[in-house]
């Protein structure tokens, strides 16, 4: 006979599964059509090569150059 703890554990497992599935859907979205930085169109070739692209090549290069100093190495 299930008790309250079993019921709550089942609810938590279902909630976790829904959250994981929602996160997977967010990361598998289509590429943006325009760059989030400069609003220039993102070429179809870039969107095909990098499906989750949100920046044009130029803006992505600048973004990576700025952020490479903040990466931590293990």
Curated annotation (Swiss-Prot):
One of its GO terms (molecular function) is zinc ion binding. Keywords: Metal-binding, Zinc, Zinc-finger. Pfam families: zf-dskA_traR (PF01258). PROSITE patterns: ZF_DKSA_1, ZF_DKSA_2. A zinc finger (dksA C4-type) spans 35-59. The keyword Zinc applies. InterPro entries: Znf_C4-type_bac (IPR020460), Znf_C4_TraR (IPR012783), Znf_DskA_TraR (IPR000962), Znf_DskA_TraR_CS (IPR020458). Signal peptide: none annotated. GO terms for biological process: positive regulation of secondary metabolite biosynthetic process. It comes from the Viruses. NCBIfam families: C4_traR_proteo. This is Uncharacterized 8.2 kDa protein in gpA 5'region. The gene is ORF82.
């Amino acid at each position: 006979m299930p008790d309250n703890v079993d019921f709550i554990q089942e609810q938590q497992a279902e909630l976790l599964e829904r959250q994981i599935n929602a996160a997977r859907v967010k990361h598998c979205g289509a590429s943006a059509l325009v760059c989030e930085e400069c609003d220039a169109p993102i070429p179809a070739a870039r969107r095909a090569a990098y499906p989750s692209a949100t920046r044009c090549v130029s803006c992505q290069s600048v973004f990576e150059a700025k952020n490479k100093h903040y990466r931590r190495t293990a």
